[in-house]
Amino acid sequence: MAGELEFEKPVVELREKISELKKFTQDSDMDLSSEITKLEARLERLEEDIYTNLKAWDRVQIARHPNRPTTLDYIEHLFTDFFECHGDRYFGDDEAIVGGIAKFRGLPVTVIGQQRGKDTKENIRRNFGMPHPEGYRKALRLMKQADKFNRPIICFIDTKGAYPGKAAEERGQSEAIAKNLFEMAGLSVPVISIVIGEGGSGGALALGVANRLLMLENSTYSVISPEGAAAILWKDSGLAKKAAETMKITAPDLKELDIIDHVIKEVRGGAHRDVEQQAAYIDEALKGELKSLLKLDKNELIQQRYNKYKSIGKISTENQYVGIK
């Protein structure tokens, strides 16, 4: 099977065996239906066991799957009347970030997201989903427009990180990201951000200062990649698997730490297995979050967002007196 991941090999091998038996029965007079039924039941149990007990590194692999749905895939399935806007009005148009105006269940919204490619040619065009400063400035332009016209903002996060090249630094990469963080904190409309793949460092956070931060079940959100963390901590990028477990970068871990608000269920095996069904899960989550946020006024939205990010990283400890009474 194309795009199989390392931990999926037992599932793939069993699927192939079932497929071979089915083909054999079609080409012969032998009835192997009983054996096929038993193998299919075994496959169901195997899939259930593997996909309900995924390790952090398994989720990293799923988040990086080449066929994983992108921002534009979800825009196609979730929104109507999408009109893409281009350019930052300073330098140019960065195709690593897409954004525009659309309708979600009839409600006018602004949609913004990082966009990866699905093949080499498109990845080069999209800079592998790593935005330049003009991408973040385009995103901010659309956010301010949404604020002016009272449209909720929905952001899709899917990037390894902001592009670290010389030209990007010369054009003010860090300033562009910092400006987004500052401006997003004060937006007077509901902001919902969803991590749909990899959420890497400040490049992800520049679309992540939201009233609600959601993650797909098999996405990741971290300050650095597992390979980068392993290289820094243990001088060996080969220990990325260990780093992934240690860093707590998966959706279940981050929900437990109160970094994110909600984990969106994924199709078994990953979102790439059924884009339409995955979009339906996201649709339901967005509907619920928007319903609650639209009840808040401008000041409540800003205060809620402020309180959310003020509390991140808070540590609670209980001190026990051990001295002389």
UniProtKB/Swiss-Prot annotation:
InterPro entries: Acetyl_CoA_COase_a_su, ClpP/crotonase-like_dom_sf, COA_CT_C
UniProt key word Lipid metabolism: yes
GO molecular function: acetyl-CoA carboxylase activity; ATP binding; carboxyl- or carbamoyltransferase activity
Pathway(s) per entry: Lipid metabolism; malonyl-CoA biosynthesis; malonyl-CoA from acetyl-CoA: step 1/1
GO process annotations (BP): fatty acid biosynthetic process; malonyl-CoA biosynthetic process
Pfam families recorded: ACCA
PROSITE patterns: COA_CT_CTER
SUPFAM superfamilies to which the protein is assigned, alphabetical: ClpP/crotonase
Domain CoA carboxyltransferase C-terminal: 38-292
Assembly information from the UniProt record: Acetyl-CoA carboxylase is a heterohexamer composed of biotin carboxyl carrier protein (AccB), biotin carboxylase (AccC) and two subunits each of ACCase subunit alpha (AccA) and ACCase subunit beta (AccD).
PANTHER family listed in its UniProt record: ACETYL-COENZYME A CARBOXYLASE CARBOXYL TRANSFERASE SUBUNIT ALPHA, ACETYL-COENZYME A CARBOXYLASE CARBOXYL TRANSFERASE SUBUNIT ALPHA, CHLOROPLASTIC
Function according to Swiss-Prot or TrEMBL: Component of the acetyl coenzyme A carboxylase (ACC) complex. First, biotin carboxylase catalyzes the carboxylation of biotin on its carrier protein (BCCP) and then the CO(2) group is transferred by the carboxyltransferase to acetyl-CoA to form malonyl-CoA.
Entry similarity comment: Belongs to the AccA family.
Name of protein: Acetyl-coenzyme A carboxylase carboxyl transferase subunit alpha
Gene: accA
